Amino acid sequence: MGQNSSERPIPTTDYKLLAGEELLRVDSFPPRHFEHSPSTIEQIKRLTNSPDTTTIGEHGPSVASLAFDVSSQTSVNPEVSPLNDQVENLSLTPDHLRLYEVLFGRDSLRVAIDLISSYPELARTTVLELAKLQGVTYNSEREEEPGRIVHEARDKDDAIAKDLTERLGWGWPYYGSVDATPEFIRTLTAYVRRTEENHAFLSQKYIDKSNTERDIAYALDMAVDWITERLSANAEGVLEFHSELEKGIENQVWKDSWDAYHHKDGTLANHTAGIASIEVQVTTYDALLDAADLYRHVLDDAHKSDSLIETAEHLKSVILAKFWTDKDGGYFVLGTDRDDNNTLRQLQIKTSNMGHTLNSRLLESNDPAIQRKRDAVVAHIASDKLLNVSGIRTLATDEVRFRAGAYHCGSVWLWDTHHIAKGLRRHGLDELADNIDRKLLHVVDTTKIFPEYVRGDDADTPSINTDRVVLWDSVNQRENIVEQPPQEVQAWTVASILAIKKRLDRRQRAIDRRKKEIL
């Protein structure tokens, strides 16, 4: 049990148990209560270590999460405990709310890309800092590879780093993700394309991990080469993950909990071979096209541009053929694994991941077959099996492993939902996208935090987990934490909410301008 938790008697009926599962313990974490809705601006300043809004991005990328600074909050709930006791409790920051106060590659890049219109400097410094940490050699403990973008950058003397090294054998910084590298390319190219600095950024110098002076164009080359090598490592040409470290992250994508990747019957994906996630393929497809455009029009390398376009088009054909099923009205499956004969198998479960195909060039086509796929995905996203009061569930309610409070198997992640809403708007589905955005704003107004995720239940009001629920899974011979409290200030949640508010402000200003023109 962590700080500020208490173990309570094990209930017999409160939690869903699958075959072979046994409830081991339930640790309670009374939530901290805040009187006012939090400020997006204040929290993004804290996350980026910026003294004011004009310096957001100047002091480096965002950390992944923080706990609220209770000294700046009115945080009293007399019904929970006597006033004096509660103030004393709130003066402490529980350990379970301080898990990710460091740089994570994918998180920082998602924050940067969501806020690039308002804070382009944040995208610049995020790309630059990650370029400095980009892999330069092969190291199994760190899962480092040349060109690979870091997953988690901790000092080796950090208390959490020491624990992970002792228990899991990780080295630092740790590179166990496959989505950070295509996200890096997408953010880099977006910054070059959309800012005044433009292609001059490609000449920006930095010192890499080998203490060698490089420029951003070199970091782009290395990231692109890492992706193309990964794609060529299998016959199908998909970007797979497979940890070579005995206790490395098993699912090296944003849904990185160990049970997130599974088959229709609940059987876990085969981790002895490569696994490919649908949203990673989609992000990689877009990253290849973005890079190709830069090579052709800025770096004057038409040959490399043509090669990347050819690779992207092949990947697109594989996505449409291998990651689509006509079952249940048709949808993009979570991903693929491999059987004992190394044959690709679909992970045929309905997840929020399918929605990521909407926020991509993948489905931008007049081809009736592709339009039917797009419409089928939208129908699933809008169904009550995925959509609830808070947003889009990570896993549909009719799937075997669905649990409303599970980390990636039923909960609602606000950044994930926001990303999908942007995709809906991209295809002209503004009304549905606006409805989903309102759900996200309602979550923050209700919980008074920027939660990492919220419950995916059928309640009328958004809520967060207050227990850590631990099961024993006899089938897979391991413990499974099926519920845990979320972080209070998750960076990509803050970025999503801030992006929504900025968009609404722009819309209102446009309306006001039109009114003035009429008058």
Can you say where each PLM-predicted feature lies in the sequence?
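Extended glycan-interaction surfaces of carbohydrate-active proteins
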Residues: P11-L103, A131-G169, S232-I275, H314-V412, ...
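Aromatic-rich carbohydrate-recognition surfaces in CAZymes
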Residues: E101-L245, I278-Q281, L347, S411-H427, ...
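PEST-like, low-complexity acidic/proline-rich intrinsically disordered segments
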Residues: G2-S5
